A protein has these predicted regions:
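N-terminal active-site beta-alpha-beta segment that forms phosphate/nucleotide-binding
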Residues: 15, 19-98, 105, 110-114
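Short N-terminal helix-initiation segments at or just after the protein's N-terminus
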Residues: 1-3, 87-97, 171, 175
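Amphipathic coiled-coil/heptad-repeat helices and related helical stalk/stem segments
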Residues: 100-101, 133
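Conserved phosphate- and dinucleotide-binding cores of soluble alpha/beta proteins
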Residues: 107-237
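SAM-dependent methyltransferases
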Residues: 1-29, 34, 54, 95, ...
Length: 237
């Protein structure tokens, strides 16, 4: 009976088809892209992309955390890590002062590799992100020699309009609530979207939708700088 009512095979088929279309279109835009079946394959793939001795910076990303790349790098003990958003076991910043985090964030631009997620990726091969501080999207488009972007298949959308709709009406409210619940950030908890789940295009001082960046590919001379690993699981927000 269960075999007739579960949708595991159908979900796998649906996500794989969309992922392969997305990978093909990213590659047409001079972005390296690869589809892997699960987080375990993603971890192996990314670790193979990071040579010993290079400096790795991390952008704030649930997907990077869920795949477990940073603990694996720490265990390997062969790479310097830059993470302005590093937190302790209670979810609090290791660097509580904003000037400390700003200084470390600037160091990200000289990293050899930047590890990060993306808010959405379109079927026609565009990466869409909305950021609060701007450090994450800035390093994606300029600075580090190589960018490795990890993304779950749940973030594949039809086009830029659908991406922005998803970000403003799902990703942003969820992220604001996450920062409130898991990182004790009362300022984010007071945002309208964190209270109601609905975006009202607010002008709150702590609004997290500040910088919108759409990556439509890279110039041929930058081919291979951006590397997308699409994972056949629902990851991140």
């Amino acid at each position: 009976m269960m075999g007739r009512i579960d949708l595991i095979k159908e979900h796998k088929w649906f996500y794989e088809k969309r992922a392969k279309i997305t990978v093909t279109n990213l590659q047409k835009k001079n972005i390296n892209a690869k589809y892997v079946a699960n987080s375990q394959e993603a971890l192996v793939t990314v670790m193979e992309m990071i040579p010993a001795g290079v400096t790795v910076a991390r952008g704030d990303s649930m997907t990077v955390d869920q795949i477990g790349i940073i603990p694996e790098l720490q265990k390997r003990k062969q790479n310097a890590l830059i993470d302005p958003m590093e937190r302790d076991a209670d979810g609090l910043f290791l660097f509580p002062e904003i000037e400390q985090r700003r200084k470390i964030a600037r160091e990200m631009f000289s990293a050899d590799i930047f590890l990060v997620g993306t808010n959405a990726v379109t079927l026609d091969g565009k990466l869409v992100n909305v950021d609060a501080w701007g450090n994450r999207v800035a390093a994606m488009i300029f600075g580090p020699d190589k960018v490795i972007i990890l993304v779950g298949v749940n973030k594949i959308v039809k086009d830029v309009n659908e991406a922005l709709e998803r970000i403003h009406n799902y990703t942003a409210p969820m992220n604001a609530k996450r920062h409130y619940l898991k990182h004790q950030r009362e300022d984010f908890g007071n945002l309208p979207c964190a209270k109601t789940s609905i975006c009202v295009d607010c002008n709150n001082d702590w609004r997290i939708c500040r910088h919108t960046v759409i990556i439509e590919g890279t110039m041929i001379r930058e081919k291979g700088r951006i590397n997308v690993v699409l994972v056949g699981e629902e990851l991140g927000i």
